[in-house]
Amino acid sequence: MAKEINSNSGLSDEQVGQSRKRCGLNVLTPPRRISLWKLYLDKYRDPIIQILLVAALISLVLAFIEHNFMETIGIFVAVFLATTVGFYFERDAAKKFHILTALSEEQPVKVRRNWRVIEIPRRDVVVDDIVLIEVGDEVPADGVLLSCTDLQINESSLTGEPMTEKSLEGGGDGAYARNVVLRSTMVMNGRGEFRVTAVGDATEIGKVAAKSTEQTAVKTPLYVQLDKLATMISKVGSIVSVAAFVLFLGHDILTNPVWGGKDYLYMADLVLEYFMMAVTLIVMAVPEGLPMAVTLSLALNMRRMLKSNNLVRKLHACETMGAVTVICTDKTGTLTQNQMQVDTLLLKQGSEHLLHLAIAVNTTAELDNDRGIGNPTESALLLWLKAKGHDYAELRKQCTVVSQQPFSTERKYMSTRVLAGGTQYLFVKGAPEIVLAKCDLDDKEKQKAQEELADFQRKAMRTLAFAYQKAEDEKMTLQAIVAITDPLRKEVPAAVQECRKAGIEVKMVTGDTAATAFEIGKQIGIFEEDNTNIGADGEMTPLEVQMITGEQWEALSDEEAYKHAQNIRVMSRARPTDKQRLVAMLQKHGEVVAVTGDGTNDAPALHYAHVGLSLGSGTSVAKEASDMTLLDDSFKSIANAVMWGRSLYRNLQRFLFFQLVVNVAALLLVLGGSIIGTEMPLTVTQILWVNLIMDTFAALALASLPPSHEVMKEKPRKASDFIISRSMGAGILFCGISFFVVMFAFLVYCERRGRGGVDTHELTWFFTTFVMLQFWNLFNAKALGSNRSAFRHFLQDKGMQLVLLLVLAGQWLIVTFGGEMFRTQPLSLKEWAIIIGSTSLVLWVGELYRAVRRAMCHQEE
């Protein structure tokens, strides 16, 4: 069909239809979307949810025997809420993300069709279309050039090459022929026309995109922890319940004479009674509020992180960022502003006006307000001119361009001949060594210029020299020396230091030269000294061990690469495969790795890392492969994400502490009640209030606690560390046993004091006291992991205030109006005051403990 195409007329409508039918739309097939029902069922893979489902099924069997379904309904509601909340938020984020990526397919593209040049959406480009490209355009499909003028293309998104000169002749030493253009690359200079040879998945970027969606088997730290917790709970619950069943049944067989008779129905009833008690123990051991707490925490963080420029695509990424031990970051755009700027301009000879004229006319760049169109270096010069109050367009009107010689890698300079004010000038700008050689300079002037240039180059700046020549002059006159830089983002050095103080190693992986990479590393604080720095083992390590090039890295065997991986701080001249290999080696060391990337070539590394961080300005393939998108492209957002992740994990620990204290106390009360022969002092409806409603409220209160900068002073937790630390476990047992002792003593007192057992009024006291103990313990849970007072920032914790109010109001309503349904009787104001005052000791003991810890820490300092 290509032979029938006239490059002047382009395709006809009929030919467009035929081509589309044969080769398809110009759209990259997104990763296979999981169906909604599969996405929802995936939430049931959570180990805690699975234990809850088993408990719910056992509870359902017992419910049919006892004709009481409240406990069963409660567990099923807890499971449904936890899974549905997680499903909703993850689906909501996915929809937002797909809207963002779909917009990119609507970018307008100029094509020749039916003898006219028209604009069509990128998705409608077909094979054999004649496409027109110019400065600032993104190439919409793969193709072969038909014509071009000074065409330079940035292929870094695909090949890593920042600038490639194109020509109609094939060949060249690059990865692709010089007459080939590739989808997703950017036109930085010149213009051209090409015939489309591949669209959609058949393009080079389409092939890379397919690789970046391969499944990986890296388990997130949180999933591993919940797995371990589920295993522990199921083991402890099973051991306690089996032991209780054997002990109580054995005691009954030894002491109850009925076992010597033939009343088998009564014996079966006793066995069933003890079995039901054992099952109740298992159900009580499972923290049914935990999945809700996890999903609420992740979902709330997801929403909040969006406000701080982090679009989280996958829920687990919120928490995994808190476990990160290594960040492998790009330089351009993340550490720097990705906006070339003139740092220093040294005027040598000639007037300022003549220099301004040279900058305005000897260029191929344009400005769209403050946005440069064309070569970034030339755009920086025009922006400098604008900042000085000069309009480059007006300056161009003051002269007539006679001829222009574009920049080329062979010549390394650009020249423009103009007629201005009746005088003819030749303006030249380019590589300093080339321009200086053309100038009339004595040794002293040349040496001074070379020293100035060397100083700029040591600071990782790009240098240019300007010169001019009047028609009657024999040699050129050095006009100016310019140092251009892609400045660091102002917030980056502080953010890097924040990460390093938090025990996170920051590694820079860049395509820049070793000298530039080293200078940037010094500026952002990756390197402390010029010669030696502290290595991964805490010892002083030579600089050559901490810096490596992509070529050197590739030459290392897997064994050598494994040994070197942790000590590397900067990798220069790196390619995408180098970054992916570094991630793999660090993961082998047990590191939790986050990776930033903006190009399609970064997609595999983003996909294989524990957390892939794409840039908002990056390619759609990079975003698709990532877990989180930095909307502002800034490294500061990464540091914020780490803080959010660590705070989230701390909040989950706080909830676990609160939840398990309730469970331990309730578990012991079931056992204790069985020992003294009384029925469970809390009814099923009361347990539902304590276990489900209060747990949900607690999840809301603790999940909504704002992130704290304090967590950034700690070292990253090990992926192998159990979510329940030793001190936390001791606190759970101490509080749980203390609450049990208080409640059990009260129960025994009431049992022995009354003649007809414990009456409803006393059981209302018991129920309210139990709830108020948990109420005050919520304050202790809030302060877990910190020696700070539980009242610190209390007025800012609106979620906590609301929950405390709801618990108090809910308890009062249940006690006052619950009646037979909740087996309660109203309490007087005096009784409420006694219960609230006495149970508040839980908080004051906690405050005293934290005050002592604070004093001890101050003494150590």
Regions found by a protein language model. Give the residues of each.
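Transmembrane alpha-helix entry/boundary detector in multi-pass membrane proteins
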Residues: 759-763
